[in-house]
């Protein structure tokens, strides 16, 4: 094995750096607690408090990392100007312009994640799988908005954007109905991916969830669900 050649090839494969590692998944669009069973508290000492601090920290981190990189942004890291605000179902590319400028200046691509947690419209721990139609519709519209934002990222950087669909939907106890939430979840993802996009430039994918705080017994988007959905929808997602 030519190890030098192997290392050189690896150096050319971009690794996507998660912006949310810089502030313990707090984000900039809300002041409430973190939800979704994620294993953080939002209280890490020394975390970035503003977009400027987060970007400066990312610059420092990237200066210490070898190889090609991309920036991975969560929807809750929208940057609003002059007191403006858009809820997650109304997010637009302009709310992420500073991230686009940051990436373009460094010759990097952007990946994206809808944020299906830490929001007052997470009802009974559910979003895309909620039996409440109003709740489910809100989160479907959020997913569609994120497809449009991902398209903008790809257009602006000239680099394909991977859009990762992950939710914390689930229950602390084993539910009587384990099929219903997954049927609704599938229908919701189908509807999100009905939003037009160029599959060469926008690469949707579905990520599974194992378990989390308060979601110990049942997760809707299990590994089996995510793998099966991706296998059955190869033309639409990774």
Pin down the residues of each PLM region:
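Active-site-proximal beta-alpha core segment in soluble small-molecule metabolic enzymes
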Residues: 141-142
């Amino acid at each position: 094995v030519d190890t030098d050649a192997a290392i050189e090839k690896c150096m050319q494969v971009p690794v996507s750096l998660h912006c949310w590692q810089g502030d313990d998944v707090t984000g900039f669009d809300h002041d409430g607690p973190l939800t979704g069973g994620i294993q953080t508290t939002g209280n890490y000492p020394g975390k970035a408090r503003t977009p400027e601090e987060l970007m400066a920290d990312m610059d420092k981190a990237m200066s210490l990392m070898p190889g090609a990189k991309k920036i991975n942004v969560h929807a809750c890291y929208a940057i609003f100007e002059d007191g403006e605000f858009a809820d997650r179902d109304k997010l637009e590319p302009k709310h992420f312009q500073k991230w686009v400028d940051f990436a373009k200046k460094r010759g990097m691509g952007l990946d994206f994640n809808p944020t299906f947690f830490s929001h007052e419209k997470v009802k009974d721990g559910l979003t895309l799988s909620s039996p409440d139609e109003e709740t489910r519709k809100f989160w479907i519209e959020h997913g569609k908005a994120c497809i449009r934002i991902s398209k903008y990222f790809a257009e602006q950087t000239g680099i394909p954007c991977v859009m990762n669909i992950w939710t914390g939907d689930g229950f602390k106890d084993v539910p009587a109905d384990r099929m219903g939430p997954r049927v609704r979840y599938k229908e919701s993802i189908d509807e999100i991916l009905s939003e037009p996009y160029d599959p060469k430039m926008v690469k949707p994918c579905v990520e599974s969830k194992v378990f989390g705080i308060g979601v110990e017994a049942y997760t809707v988007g299990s590994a089996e669900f995510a793998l099966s959905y991706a296998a059955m929808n190869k033309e639409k997602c990774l």
